[in-house]
């Protein structure tokens, strides 16, 4: 598991220290919205992923501060019956003991930067790409706004919420059935109730009954995000470099929805957290693919759910690029990739830019 053995994966020690994986476990409530995790359980059995079924008593034992009344469907705070139980109670959840979170995502990105630099990579910051240089349907490099040009026979679009713009610049969108688009997201950072040591005793919880997920944060704080229920309007952004980075009423809605589960939560008037962008596809599944322009590849559309997969996604992209540069036609005969920790081979074509929208998707950050 790459995050557990982060130093081994990097093969380099960052002067800022290394990000840490906290194996707290993760509880996913079994709800109407996720079909009581029937498909998830089958997949876990197939892949031998450890899990435990917790009944209501077990959940209350582990989360004594939780109110297990049902509030489904999730609502906005101004909607009728917001905060009122529908008369039922959550009965069970699935706990994944080997799950967890990475303590500092920004530090983990810096760790990868330093490891890449150690092997010869160079980084340019605050630079704007204005042209994807190409000749005879082959990429030849990139041109920046200041006029600098960098030649290369391979270019990978891993531009996050700017990926749509870069693909347009490269003129590779005509054959794409799946596209990307920046989506504004708000994540709440709030104090845990004083009676709860959530930092040390808490764990990741996914709760589609109230439409939020949460995890512990240092300083006995809680991070709360939306699971994108239908009531939460999507805030699409046209320009990833120019959008409103202020919190909206969504911040308070997320806090109040979580407070349905944790009545002791103090509702602060001071907004804290993160406002940023997802790079979202139509089915919230990423694009890991080649393109109609030879040598130009895509690792985009991460849709808020691919950070955890970054180490293996990088290895998969390397395999895909080698496969295509050896004159294999990935569109017709997709590359296969072995997942070493579970000894399973996957079809990389699953992530194709030319795929049909996956109807089995959650169409949310859950992927």
Residue ranges and their predicted role:
Residues 1-79, 211-212, 366:
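Dinucleotide-binding Rossmann-like beta1-alpha1 core, especially the glycine-rich loop
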Residues 4-11, 16-23, 133, 138, ...:
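Active-site substrate-recognition segment that forms the wall
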Residues 53, 292-367:
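C-terminal lid/capping helical subdomain adjacent to the catalytic/cofactor pocket in oxidative enzymes
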Residues 55, 125-127, 272:
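Short loop/edge segments at beta-strand edges and connector loops
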Residues 61-92, 330-340:
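Charged, glycine/proline-rich intrinsically disordered loops and linkers
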Residues 66-68, 72-86, 267-312:
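FAD-binding beta-loop-beta segment adjacent to the flavin cofactor pocket
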Residues 80-154, 158, 165:
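Helical element adjacent to the flavin cofactor pocket in flavoenzyme catalytic cores
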Residues 94-114, 160-162, 209, 246-257, ...:
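Mid-domain beta-loop-alpha active-site segment that forms a flexible
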């Amino acid at each position: 598991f790459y995050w557990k053995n982060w130093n081994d994966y990097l093969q380099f020690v960052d002067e800022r220290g290394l990000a840490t994986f906290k194996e707290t476990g993760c509880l996913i409530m079994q709800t109407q919205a996720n079909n009581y995790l029937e498909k998830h359980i089958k997949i876990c059995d197939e892949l031998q992923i450890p899990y435990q079924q917790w009944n209501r008593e077990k959940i209350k034992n582990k989360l004594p501060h939780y109110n297990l009344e049902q509030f489904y469907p999730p609502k906005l705070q101004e909607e009728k019956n917001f905060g009122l139980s529908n008369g039922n109670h959550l009965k069970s959840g699935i706990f994944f003991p080997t799950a967890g979170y990475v303590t500092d995502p920004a530090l983990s990105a810096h760790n990868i930067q330093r490891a890449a630099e150690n092997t010869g990579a160079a980084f340019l910051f605050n630079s704007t790409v204005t042209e994807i240089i190409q000749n005879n349907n082959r990429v030849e490099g990139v041109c920046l706004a200041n006029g600098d040009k960098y030649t290369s026979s391979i270019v990978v679009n891993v531009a996050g919420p700017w990926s749509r713009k870069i693909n347009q610049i490269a003129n590779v969108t005509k054959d794409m059935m799946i596209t990307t688009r920046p989506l504004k997201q708000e994540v709440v950072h709030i104090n845990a109730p004083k009676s709860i040591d959530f930092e040390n005793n808490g764990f990741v919880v996914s709760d589609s009954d109230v439409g939020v997920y949460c995890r512990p944060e240092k300083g006995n704080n809680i991070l709360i995000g939306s699971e994108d229920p239908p009531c939460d309007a999507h805030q699409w952004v046209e320009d990833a470099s120019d959008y409103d980075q202020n919190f909206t009423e969504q911040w308070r809605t997320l806090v109040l929805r979580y407070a349905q589960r944790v009545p002791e939560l103090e509702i602060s008037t001071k907004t804290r957290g993160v406002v940023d962008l997802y790079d979202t596809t139509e089915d919230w599944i990423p694009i890991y693919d080649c393109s109609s322009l030879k040598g130009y590849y895509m690792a985009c559309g991460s849709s808020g759910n691919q950070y955890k997969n970054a180490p293996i996604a990088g290895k998969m992209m390397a395999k895909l690029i080698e496969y295509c540069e050896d004159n294999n036609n990935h569109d017709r005969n997709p590359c296969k990739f072995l997942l070493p920790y579970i000894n399973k081979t996957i079809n990389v074509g699953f992530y194709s830019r030319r795929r049909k929208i996956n109807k089995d998707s959650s169409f949310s950050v859950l992927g």
